[in-house]
A protein has these predicted regions:
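HotDog/MaoC-like acyl-thioester-processing domains
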Residues: 1-48, 109-111, 121-147
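Intrinsic-disorder/low-complexity, polar/charged segments enriched in Ser/Thr/Lys/Arg/Asp/Glu/Gln
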Residues: 7, 54-61, 100, 114-116, ...
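Generic anion/oxyanion-binding catalytic loop in active/binding sites
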Residues: 9, 69, 101
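Generic structural detector for well-ordered beta-strands
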Residues: 11-13, 61-65, 104, 146
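Hot-dog-fold acyl-thioester-processing enzymes
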Residues: 16-97
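Intrinsically disordered, low-complexity segments enriched in small/polar residues
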Residues: 78, 103, 116-117, 125, ...
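Active-site beta-strand->loop segment that positions catalytic residues and contacts the acyl thioester
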Residues: 100-121
Length: 147
């Protein structure tokens, strides 16, 4: 068997696509998606909310490319890390010493959106990238990279 490369935890909600409001999940839907105990053998922990830094060191704008869009018409999750990598200073990117990361998704990113990528170093042990919609100013995601 291969080496474990990544684990993940998430909280899920059911959203009405028309109203964009959270809805109560039906028993029928719960029954359709049962846990697989053999695949949940890592320590569970409560998800904590990442906070937006008070100040930033740099900002770039990026227009979302069609190739980054998944079948749900949202930006694929891997590209959140790609955007974070694009804003990091070159010496940090070259050092390649990120040991862990967290992503807090707040709002979907879609094709053609212009995203402002903000970079901060709030601690000596991490970097934080905040992704905001340039038009609305809404936070789309906060990414924390640990060194």
């Amino acid at each position: 068997m291969g080496e474990l490369l990544i684990t993940g935890i998430s909280n899920w909600v059911h959203i009405n696509l028309k109203s964009k409001k959270i809805e109560k999940v039906t028993d029928q839907l719960i029954d359709a998606y049962q846990l697989e105990p053999e695949k949940t053998n890592f320590n569970e922990r409560k998800l904590k909310k990442l906070k937006e830094p008070e100040t930033y060191l740099n900002c770039i704008d990026y227009k979302i490319d069609l190739n980054w869009i998944d079948v749900n018409n949202h930006m694929n999750n891997i590209y959140y890390l790609e955007l974070a990598d694009m804003i990091l200073p070159e010496e940090i990117r070259k050092s390649n010493n990120c040991s862990n990361f967290e992503i807090m998704y707040k709002k979907e990113i879609k094709y053609g959106d212009i995203i402002k990528c903000y970079y901060a170093e709030p601690e000596n042990t991490s970097y934080v990238v905040t992704l905001k919609n340039a038009e609305t100013g809404e936070i789309c995601a906060i990414i924390k990279l640990y060194i």
